[in-house]
Amino acid sequence: MSKPNQTLGEFIIENQSDFPGSSGELSRLINSLRLAAKVVNHEVNKAGLVDIIGAYGETNVQGEDQQKLDVYANNKFIQTLTNREIVCGIASEENDDFIQIEGHKGDHQNKYVVLMDPLDGSSNIDVNVSVGTIFSIYQRVTPVGTPVQKEDFLQPGNKQVAAGYIIYGTSTMLVYTTGHGVNGFTLNPALGSWYLSHPDMKFPEEGQIYSINEGNYIHFPQGVKDYIKYCQQEEGNRPYTSRYIGSMVSDIHRNMIKGGIFMYPKSSKASEGKLRLLYECNPFAFITEQAGGKASDGFQRIMDIDPTELHQRVPFFCGSKKMVEKAEEFMANAKANPQSQEFSFSSK
């Protein structure tokens, strides 16, 4: 039961009963993530005053130019989790391979692994657009006491223990789930504490916002083009409006509050999709489903996909349940009728 002015620490302690036999390890892990987020938030807020914006001069494993804040955030989250000896391994979008972590005694007694995108949307930081951190937590599948292995990270999203994101915007929020609903906490910068501000967050079943980079329209699959036309068509007084920030955390956060769909399909420029299954799609799929929404690759549930590599990419559709289902309907019809250039938009 949420309480007025409840802090994140109080909330975590109160809800440990959701996990019978819990040792408190997951609680300490989430506490460590909130600490790292506060440190990163401090740097994001003064980015225009110090030499921490702009390109770092290197590319990550994705072939993307690393921003200085990408590197800073990645280092801070890894350092915080490593120093507290509460995880056995970390995989980051910014690193080629996973990181094995052992305790100060040289042992491997911890049972959780963390996968993360330390700073999503960082290319927008120069123009003062909100950015965010995305994280996902799993229990390892290899024996405790042994070094973590790749298979500990290559688990389907339905095995997640917890997932969340931090949005660094006009206010800083941490939103997360442990499989018992979604709750949002806002940082009070004067006190340095996170307070429960958005209890039991839910996607409206139907929404009015569709979020997609329409500049890539010509490269999209026919089903996606058809769905966009459906949203734009005036016939039937459809209430849809396009809103796209270009920061995944910001777009999905808004859509969860207002109601809408976020889409990043495959395209002729990115045949497998662009977003990472493990670092971006799985955590947001878990959050979305716990908030009453839906997440898929256009044809199947995201969290049922068995990953084959750490940096695997997939198409991604998530948001209000009815909007995602309608997009899937257009995708299915385009696949079943490949010769047809347009689907009938008369359906309600």
Swiss-Prot record:
Q: How is the cofactor bound?
A: Binds 2 magnesium ions per subunit.
One Pfam family, please name it: FBPase_C
**Keywords, in A-Z order:** Carbohydrate metabolism, Cytoplasm, Hydrolase, Magnesium, Metal-binding
Q: Where in the cell is it found?
A: Cytoplasm
Q: What pathway, per the record?
A: Carbohydrate biosynthesis; gluconeogenesis
From the UniProt record, list the coiled-coil ranges: none
Question: What residues bind substrate, as annotated?
Answer: 120-123, 213, 244, 274
Please give the Gene Ontology molecular function terms for this protein.
fructose 1,6-bisphosphate 1-phosphatase activity; magnesium ion binding
Q: Where does Mg(2+) 2 bind?
A: 117, 120, 280
Instruction: Please provide the Gene Ontology terms (biological process) for this protein.
Output: fructose 1,6-bisphosphate metabolic process; fructose 6-phosphate metabolic process; fructose metabolic process; gluconeogenesis; sucrose biosynthetic process
Show the GO cellular component annotation of the record. cytosol
Please tell me which top-level EC class this enzyme sits in: hydrolase
Chemical reaction(s) catalysed? beta-D-fructose 1,6-bisphosphate + H2O = beta-D-fructose 6-phosphate + phosphate
Q: Does the keyword Magnesium apply?
A: yes
Please tell me where this protein is predominantly located.
cytoplasm
Question: Key word Metal-binding present in the record?
Answer: yes
Q: Which cofactor does it need?
A: Mg(2+)
Q: Name the protein family.
A: Belongs to the FBPase class 1 family.
Q: How does it assemble?
A: Homotetramer.
Name of the featured protein: Fructose-1,6-bisphosphatase class 1 2
Organism phylogeny: Bacteria, Pseudomonadati, Bacteroidota, Flavobacteriia, Flavobacteriales
